[in-house]
Regions:
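Peripheral, non-AAA+ core regions of ATP-driven protein-machinery
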Residues: 1-163
Length: 163
C-alpha cells in the first residue's frame, strides 16, 4: 500500500481553505478514481492528469489509483486540483520523493501536454499558504498576482516537468 499526501487550496469567496489531497496506489485491476469532486469535474481531471503524466514522460501506475480530496463538504471546482493530484500520484508511486512535499502546496490546471494553465484565486491561495508556513507551487502565468502577498513564498512553474 502506497499513500501520499499533498496540500492545495480551494476557493470560497475571498478565502482559500486548505484541501488535503490523498493519493493511494495499490494492486488490483487498473482503475483511476477521484473522490470529492462533482462527477463532471472528476472525469475531466482524470483525463487531464493521466494525459499530462504520460506526455511528461512519467508512468501512470498500473493497478488501482484512488485520490481523495478533503474536506468532502468543501465545494471544489475548476482544474486547480490537477497539479496536486498529479504530484500525489507521482509520490505514491515513488516516482518523486514524498518527504519533500510537507512544506509545499500545489495549484494549477494541467493541459494534456503537461503545461500548467492559469487559475483563479492565486492571491488568496498565497495568503493561506503563507499563513500555514508553506510555499505555494503555482503556474507561472499567475505568479505576479501571487507575489503581491507580503512575505509570499511561491515557486512558479510552466509545466509538470518544471515542478
Amino acid at each position: 500500500m502506497r499513500v501520499a499526501v499533498v496540500y492545495s487550496r480551494g476557493l470560497a469567496g475571498l478565502d482559500a481553505p486548505l484541501v488535503r489531497v490523498e493519493a493511494h496506489v495499490g494492486g488490483g485491476l487498473p482503475q483511476f478514481r477521484i473522490v470529492g469532486l462533482p462527477d463532471t469535474e472528476v472525469k475531466e481531471a482524470r483525463d487531464r492528469v493521466r494525459a499530462a503524466l504520460n506526455t511528461s514522460r512519467f508512468e501512470f501506475p498500473d493497478g488501482r489509483v484512488t485520490v481523495n480530496l478533503e474536506p468532502a463538504d468543501l465545494p471544489k471546482e475548476s482544474g486547480r486540483f490537477d497539479l496536486p493530484i498529479a504530484i500525489g500520484i507521482l509520490a505514491a508511486s515513488h516516482q518523486i520523493p514524498a518527504r519533500e512535499l510537507a512544506n509545499l502546496e500545489f495549484a494549477g490546471e494541467l493541459g494534456l501536454s503537461g503545461d500548467l494553465r492559469a487559475i483563479r484565486g492565486a492571491l488568496a491561495m498565497t495568503f493561506g499558504a503563507h499563513r500555514d508556513g508553506r510555499t505555494l507551487v503555482i503556474t507561472e502565468s499567475v505568479a505576479a498576482e501571487a507575489s503581491l502577498a507580503p512575505g509570499a513564498m511561491i515557486l512558479p512553474a510552466r509545466s509538470l516537468l518544471d515542478v
